[in-house]
C-alpha cells in the first residue's frame, strides 16, 4: 500500500488495555526508547510540526496515541517510550506492560512496526528485545536510525553497519526528523507502506 498523506488528526489516547482502538483499520506502530524522536518522526512524516506533542524531556508520552491518516485509511500509533530510567518502578512497569500488551496481545491490525533508534546510541539491549518481540509476533518491521543529522558520514556509516548487523535482516533507514527533505520523507513513507 503506497500512500500520500493528505490529512492527519488526533483520534484518541489510551492508558488502559480495555480501551484499545481495534476497529479493523490498519495501524502503523511507532515504537522506541524514550527521547529517540518518535513524536518528531510522526510530525515529519505528516509534514506538520504540531500534530504530535514533542518535548526535550524524555518520558513525556505515557499513553498510546492514535492518529487518523487520510480519514481512517490507517492509524499512526505513537507508543510511549521504553527504558526511561527516571520513571518510578511502578510507572515504568505500567508503561512497559501497556506497550507489550499492544504489540503482543491486542487485536490491533499492525500493518508495520517502525522501531526508531537514536543513531548515535545505536541498538541497545532494550531495542534488541523489542526486535525479538516484534519478530515473534510476525509484525513487519522497519528500523529508522533517527537523528542522522547529528553524525558525520564516517560515524554514520559505522553506526548503520552495527545497527544492520543487530537488525536480523530488517530494513534499516537513516533519517532525520528535523532536517528530512520531501524526497527523504516520501522514500520513508514508501518503505513503511510497502507490503
Residue ranges and their predicted role:
Residues 5-18, 150-195:
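Canonical P-loop GTPase G-domain recognition
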Residues 45-49, 103, 167, 192:
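Hydrophobic aliphatic residues
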Residues 71-110:
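Conserved nucleotide-sensing/catalytic segment adjacent to the nucleotide-binding pocket
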Amino acid at each position: 500500500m503506497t500512500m500520500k498523506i493528505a490529512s492527519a488528526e488526533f483520534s484518541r489516547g489510551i492508558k488502559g488495555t480495555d480501551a484499545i482502538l481495534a476497529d479493523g483499520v490498519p495501524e502503523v506502530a511507532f515504537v522506541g526508547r524514550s527521547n529517540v524522536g518518535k513524536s518528531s518522526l510522526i510530525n515529519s512524516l505528516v509534514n506538520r510540526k504540531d500534530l504530535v506533542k514533542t518535548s526535550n524531556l524524555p518520558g513525556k508520552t505515557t499513553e498510546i496515541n492514535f492518529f487518523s491518516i487520510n480519514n481512517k485509511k490507517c492509524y499512526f500509533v505513537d507508543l510511549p517510550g521504553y527504558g526511561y530510567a527516571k520513571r518510578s518502578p511502578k510507572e515504568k512497569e505500567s508503561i512497559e506492560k501497556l506497550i507489550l500488551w499492544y504489540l503482543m496481545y491486542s487485536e490491533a491490525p499492525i500493518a508495520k512496526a517502525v522501531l526508531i533508534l537514536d543513531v548515535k546510541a545505536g541498538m541497545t539491549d532494550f531495542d534488541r528485545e523489542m526486535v525479538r518481540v516484534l519478530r515473534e509476533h510476525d509484525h513487519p518491521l522497519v528500523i529508522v536510525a533517527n537523528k542522522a543529522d547529528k553524525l558525520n558520514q564516517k560515524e554514520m556509516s559505522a553506526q548503520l553497519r552495527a545497527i544492520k548487523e543487530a537488525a536480523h535482516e530488517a530494513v534499516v533507514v537513516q533519517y532525520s526528523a528535523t532536517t528530512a527533505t520531501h524526497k527523504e520523507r516520501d522514500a520513508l513513507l514508501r518503505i513503511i507502506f510497502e507490503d
